[in-house]
Amino acid sequence: VLTYAKLDLWAKFQDFQVRIRNAIVKRQALDRIMIGFNGVKRAKTSNRAENPLLQDVNKGWLQKIREDAPDHVMGSTTKDGATTAGAVKVGKGGDYANLDAVVMDAVNELIDVVYQDDDDLVVVCGRELLSDKYFPLVNKEQDNSEKIAADLIISQKRMGGLQAVRAPFFPAKALLITRLDNL
């Protein structure tokens, strides 16, 4: 948010207009990312109060995948042309024991064979899933050697053998396996 207080603070700088332009360009880019990950429809008039993640501005990347390629969405079922999203349970008694297994299965089963070995594939994931995976490593007393090993594992941020990437405004409990230049 570009407040009056911030404008007043910046007014004394030679690059005042550049700072304003940069703030506007950054906000526009973040809004495009927010729409890309959260957009589900295009409303005639957007309502920011009801759709704080800009869900009604336009269809985003994830929604287009749900609609145009439902067979590439894990947990979804299509019957008579209607696709229903389903939950994928991870953990004891769930569909998968851990997130690594989810990613490996998704790469093997949901991604076309010609793209499965692409070295540029990454897992774009929500903050909560990344935290669920790595929090148990840091939430305990450890010897120095174990702490160093945990730090190394966390710094690599991998899921199912792919680089894990956090993106702003990505849904908290979702995964997207793609190339970053595909977005």
For the regions a language model picked out, list residue spans one by one.
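Beta-sheet entry/capping signal
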Residues: 120-122, 174
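C-terminal structured domain segments
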Residues: 157-183
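Flexible, glycine/threonine- and acidic-rich loop/arm segments that mediate assembly and lattice contacts
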Residues: 1-120, 127-146, 151-153, 169
